[in-house]
UniProtKB/Swiss-Prot annotation:
Keyword Glycoprotein: no
Family: Belongs to the NDRG family.
Positions of region (Disordered): 326-375
GO biological process, one term: decidualization
Keyword Protein biosynthesis found: no
InterPro entries assigned: AB_hydrolase_fold (IPR029058), NDRG (IPR004142)
Modified residues (N-acetylmethionine): M1
PANTHER family given in the database record: N-MYC DOWNSTREAM REGULATED
Record PTM Phosphoserine, positions in chain: S331, S334, S335, S338, S341, S352, S361, S374
Residue ranges, compositional bias (Polar residues): 347-359
Species this chain originates from: Mus musculus (Mouse)
Protein name: Protein NDRG3
Bias-annotated ranges (Low complexity): 330-346
Pfam families, per the entry: Ndr
Length: 375
């Protein structure tokens, strides 16, 4: 436990050691584009150049954030350079959420979540991108999932952090409407990102994001994006039934890594999403001692998981591996040797003592459970 605490404190520090708390929010060597789509203008930021026929890493942020506050701590993390040297990165900002965005005109109809997903194909076409590996958080994870369901040929893999695949129930909708009259939108967004324990214990991090949401994000535009997210439809994904080959079944066909911190308010939703996805190509990563923004609080662990995820897809095979990846490789070596996907076994990896525990019965090769990893 002491080791986990040391890692957590070390990785939070770079976010907070600047006087304004935004040091790792900065972009480096990027190009910005405003791209017109049938559903309006979208702002994108490109890091690096496309590498041959490799997919581009495309990110989509959550409500109350933009690509800088959601992803730059992660992509500026030192170990991520081993990945970004092999891939171009395309950060997408939802309409009106980018830094210094002007307010929309009165009466502007903000795109629905489905329409936000349909803004992505014109972006890829404009930038001559053939396919993506998506990384989405919260609302961004939902948008990328919808995009992958509608355009599976354009998506090679997805990393979905804090995803909620369900529509907002009418009781939740009514509660959010009532709370909107009595609660500041900043507090609503903070409660979306962080659980009560984190809100009370990690005061520096919470203050950093409170100021960012209140001062750096256009409040009128944020209200519109929040309304769009609250009005989302159910993704209507279904877990395939063993032995049944039904092309009409709606599910994510690409390799998928689900990520959630064990103290995140999104745990229940992510577990629900996991239960609906094909276990053959899905991995669920539960990050210990972690709250609602694992890419910010523990970028090292997430980088290692992402590196291993890319290796499983056949990319960057020479990348270095730390204990998390080595323990997972050891526990799946027999299945890989027999031609089985490393993502088709259920394994729990304990970083604190380097041990791993198989969750399958010894006499049955489990090919139909999602791999669940704790780190």
């Amino acid at each position: 436990m002491d080791e986990l605490q040391d890692v957590q404190l070390t990785e939070i520090k770079p976010l907070l050691n600047d006087k304004n708390g935004t040091r790792n929010f900065q972009d480096f060597d990027c190009q910005e584009h405003d791209i017109e789509t049938p559903h309006g203008m979208v702002h994108v930021t490109i890091r690096g150049l496309p590498k041959g026929n490799r997919p581009v890493i495309l990110t989509y942020h959550d409500i109350g954030l933009n690509h800088k506050s959601c992803f730059n701590t992660f992509f500026n993390f030192e170990d991520m350079q081993e990945i970004t040297q092999h891939f171009a990165v395309c950060h997408v900002d939802a309409p009106g959420q980018q830094e210094a965005a002007p307010s929309f005109p009165t009466g502007y109809q903000y795109p629905t979540m489905d329409e936000l997903a349909e803004m992505l194909p014109p972006v890829l076409t404009h930038l001559s991108m053939k396919s993506i590996i998506g990384i989405g958080v919260g609302a961004g994870a939902y948008i990328l999932s919808r995009f992958a369901l509608n355009h599976p040929e354009l998506v090679e893999g997805l990393v979905l952090i804090n995803i909620d695949p369900c529509a907002k129930g009418w009781i939740d909708w009514a509660a959010s409407k009532l709370s909107g009259f009595t609660t500041n939108i900043v507090d609503i967004i903070l409660a979306h990102h962080f659980g009560q324990e984190e809100l009370q214990a990690n005061l520096d991090l919470i203050q950093t994001y409170r100021l960012h949401i209140a001062q750096d994000i256009n409040q009128e535009n944020l209200q519109l994006f929040l309304g769009s997210y609250n009005g989302r439809r159910d993704l209507e994904i279904e877990r395939p039934i063993l032995g049944q080959n039904d092309n009409r079944l709606k599910t994510l066909k690409c390799s998928t890594l689900l990520v959630v911190g064990d103290n995140s308010p999104a745990v229940e939703a992510v577990v629900e999403c996991n239960s609906r996805l094909d276990p053959i190509n899905t991995t669920l990563l539960k990050m210990a001692d972690c709250g609602g923004l694992p890419q910010v609080v523990q970028p090292g662990k997430l980088t290692e998981a992402f590196k291993y995820f890319l290796q499983g897809m056949g990319y960057i095979p020479s990348a270095s591996m730390t204990r998390l990846a080595r323990s997972r490789t050891h526990s799946t070596s027999s299945s890989i040797g027999s031609g089985e996907s490393p993502f088709s076994r259920s394994v729990t990896s304990n970083q604190s003592d380097g041990t791993q525990e198989s969750c399958e019965s010894p006499d049955v090769l489990d090919r139909h459970q999602t791999m669940e990893v704790s780190c």
